[in-house]
């Protein structure tokens, strides 16, 4: 009985340790850039550039909290500084 209880407690503590280390990882994506990292570009495949042109792509990107958008072939690319 004690071996099973010790194994169970060790298992629970191991799971808690793994979960806490997985949730506590820091990311650099939300840190302020101050122009050091340059700009980030994300391209989407909706047909905005085909049907609505550059203006449609730009307004789509601004609703997604990007700085601006431009068309590259049929893709709409959004840019953040």
From Swiss-Prot:
Disulfide bridge map: 43-78, 49-71, 57-76, 61-77
Q: What is its main location?
A: secreted
**Signal peptide limits:** 1-24
Biological processes per GO annotation:
defense response to fungus; killing of cells of another organism
Protein family according to the UniProt entry: Belongs to the DEFL family.
Q: What is this protein called?
A: Putative defensin-like protein 102
Superkingdom of the source? Answer: Eukaryota
Arranged from A to Z, the UniProt key words for this protein are: Antimicrobial, Disulfide bond, Fungicide, Plant defense, Secreted, Signal
Protein biosynthesis is among the record's keywords:
no
State a GO cellular component annotated for this protein.
extracellular region
Is the keyword Signal assigned to this protein?
A: yes
Q: Where in the cell is it found?
A: Secreted
